[in-house]
A protein has these predicted regions:
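Metal-dependent phosphoesterase core characteristic of DEDDh/y 3'-5' exonuclease domains
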Residues: 2, 11-13, 17-19, 32-38, ...
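Short gly/ser/thr-rich secondary-structure transition/capping motifs
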Residues: 2-7, 23, 79
Length: 194
């Protein structure tokens, strides 16, 4: 194992030993007006801490539903972000997050919190600082040159397949994506696939 891969393995092990929470969201889209429609948080043992649909402030576009399968009918009676913000923040402050594509999910958490006037609490302030990006660690492990911070970014399902991590449930649903992220970090902690 190279020094770089040993360091990557050590970081992955540390995230697992620190009992970080693995988080994933599904959203109404990619833009500045997108918001969260599903969130899942699991611990490093795979225990589900929170797994819920989230009722957005506007209808879910058909393009987003085509990706994750979440419809307006499914979220009709779901809690709003305001209802779950405190629980998510509490878990964040206690454990910190590991996220596959942290920049995206932290932006969507902030955007969704802002819709409810919750963007100025400590949670949103520290979100980027205490969130580790599994995608960047994996990109560094693979070492393929790319235009994003020097490395090629790999889709979650592709990274999982390369590391021999099976998909439990439907990809592009928050629980399945959390489990894939945990599986990738577990694989990296053990040295990762060549």
């Amino acid at each position: 194992m190279s020094i770089t891969n040993a360091t990557i393995s050590q970081r992955a092990k540390k995230w697992l030993e620190d009992d970080r929470i693995f988080i994933d969201t599904e959203t109404t889209g990619l833009g500045d007006d997108a918001e969260i429609v599903e969130i899942c948080l699991i611990d490093s043992a795979g225990f589900i801490m929170l797994n819920t649909l989230v009722k957005p402030t506007k209808p879910i576009p058909a393009e987003a539903t085509a990706i994750h399968g979440i419809t307006d009918e499914m979220v009709m009676y779901a809690p709003t972000w305001k209802d779950i913000h405190g629980a998510v923040a509490s878990l964040f402050f206690e454990y910190g997050f590991v996220i596959y594509n942290a920049d995206y999910d932290t932006r969507l958490i902030y955007q969704t919190a802002k819709l409810y006037g919750l963007e100025n609490d400590g949670f949103c302030y520290f979100l980027n600082e205490r969130s580790a990006c599994a995608m960047m660690l994996y990109a560094e492990h693979r070492g393929e040159p790319g235009r994003f911070k020097g490395y090629k970014w790999h889709k979650l399902v592709d990274a999982a397949a390369h590391e021999g991590v099976s998909v439990e449930g439907k990809a592009h649903r928050a629980l399945a994506d959390c489990r894939m992220t945990l599986g990738i970090i577990d694989a990296l902690a053990k040295g990762g696939a060549a």
